[in-house]
Swiss-Prot record:
PROSITE patterns: MFS
Keyword annotations from UniProtKB, A to Z: Antibiotic resistance, Cell inner membrane, Cell membrane, Membrane, Transmembrane, Transmembrane helix, Transport
Membrane topology: Multi-pass membrane protein
Lineage of the organism: Bacteria, Pseudomonadati, Pseudomonadota, Gammaproteobacteria, Enterobacterales
Pfam families: MFS_1 (PF07690)
GO biological process: response to antibiotic
The protein's name: Multidrug resistance protein MdtL
HAMAP family in UniProt: MFS_MdtL (MF_01530)
Stated role: Confers resistance to chloramphenicol.
InterPro entries for this protein: MFS, MFS_dom, MFS_Efflux_Transporters, MFS_trans_sf, Multidrug-R_MdtL
Compartment(s): Cell inner membrane
PANTHER family (UniProt xref): CHLORAMPHENICOL EFFLUX PUMP RV0191 (PTHR43124:SF3), PURINE EFFLUX PUMP PBUE (PTHR43124)
Length: 391
């Protein structure tokens, strides 16, 4: 079982590493490519667009051909794209490389969740996804630090060579350690069960909405945090970095505690707790009389996301034993596109950073609480504890 957990964690971590590691080198990249930092900030959106594009087909291919035939090309593409970015001499070529990086990371991301659905029952999967969420929270803190240390001695291109090295590690794991987990091709008698695994299932759609809103909350916080903490609250850059590191610490602590909480409380209880924390955070930020209270509200955001997201993802994947890849893709596309759409619309309408965060917190909590309370899970699908190997 450990091989599947190690491979899944490695496959997922390409996604945040591709986002966070290069940011520290952005000023030098812009200077070398004769572009402004503002022009290259679009590289974040281009990377997410690549991920979303990969998710359109990766899940279906993973369900038809297997997990490895998607993971291996995905890791290989991430390696090639990282090298391409390091060799880029214009901003257009750099952005093209970032799109290809997103494609590779998106393929790996989809496969990771499909593998966990294949190999773990509902309760164990919720625990593992919570742990995975905690590990993912480390990357936004460690990646810029690692990038800074690399750039003390080497040029910015070394950041992408480091990403390529990470991709090589994932490729080796996918080639030599990962075993195929896709369930055997459905027989005629399995067709009714396959057809019953509809993406229009009310329970699945409710979890898509809940996880998309939750991701929108955390990405809105990440996007608005420089404005909130430095421009509005007046913290210096060093203090901002410290606060963000502390919020990551809160996220990790709660994420690593959630598996133990699942041994005591029902998943539904933790999901309700998550949304109550979001609601409390929104109200706290709305009425906050001081910076200290506002910072407390921010910690509630991190705790709320960490306690509920892994559980909600596990529940979303639960109904799909034969279409786990497609379900994973659907979740990823909804989360990437939904959160990006909200942030873009809020900016176009002219909603301030503070109100943008408060608005999504309150909307997420109210909608999600209603869905949790009124949309019950259907008949549970048998878990795939036994791995099906293919010749």
């Amino acid at each position: 079982m450990s091989r599947f957990l190690i491979c899944s964690f490695a496959l997922v971590l390409l996604y945040p590493a591709g986002i966070d590691m290069y940011l520290v080198g952005l000023p030098r990249i812009a200077a070398d490519l004769n572009a402004s930092e503002a022009q290259l900030h679009i590289a974040f959106s281009v990377y997410l667009a690549g991920m979303a594009a990969a998710m359109l087909f990766a899940g279906k291919v993973a369900d038809r051909s297997g997990r490895k035939p998607v993971a291996i090309p995905g890791a290989a593409l991430f390696i090639i794209a990282s090298v391409f970015c390091s060799l880029a001499e214009t901003s257009a070529l750099f952005l093209a490389g970032r799109f290809l990086q997103g494609l590779g990371a998106g393929c790996c991301y989809v496969v990771a969740f499909a593998i966990l659905r294949d190999t773990l029952d509902d309760r164990r999967r919720a625990k593992v996804l919570s742990l995975l969420n905690g590990i993912t929270c480390i990357i936004p803190v460690l990646a810029p630090v690692l990038g800074h240390l690399i750039m003390l001695k080497f040029p910015w291109q070394s950041l992408f060579w480091t990403m390529a090295t990470m991709g090589i590690a994932v490729l080796m794991l996918s080639l030599f350690i990962l075993k195929e987990t896709r369930p055997a091709a459905p027989t005629t008698s399995d067709k009714p069960r396959e057809n019953s695994e509809s993406l229009l299932n009310r329970f699945f759609l409710s979890r898509v909405v809940i996880t998309t809103l939750s991701v929108s909350v955390i990405l809105t916080f990440v996007n608005t945090s420089p404005v909130l903490l430095m421009e509005i609250m007046g913290f210096e850059r060093g203090e901002y970095a410290t606060i963000m590191a502390l919020t990551a610490g809160v996220s990790m602590t709660v994420s690593f505690s959630t598996p133990f909480a699942l041994g005591i409380f029902k998943p539904r209880t933790l999901m309700i707790t998550s949304q109550v924390l979001f609601l409390a955070a929104g109200i706290t930020l709305a009425v906050s009389p001081s910076h200290a209270v506002s910072l407390f509200g921010i910690t509630l955001i991190c705790a709320g996301f960490s306690v509920g997201f892994g559980v909600a993802m596990s529940q979303a994947l639960g109904p799909f034993s034969l279409r786990a890849g497609v379900a994973s893709s659907t979740l990823g596309i909804a989360q990437v596109c939904g959160s990006s759409l909200w942030i873009w619309l809020a900016a176009v309408v002219g909603i301030g950073a503070w109100n943008m965060l408060i608005g999504i917190l309150i909307a997420c909590s109210i909608v999600s609480l209603l869905l949790i309370m009124f949309v019950a899970p259907g008949r549970p699908v048998a878990a795939h504890e036994e791995i099906h190997h293919h010749a």
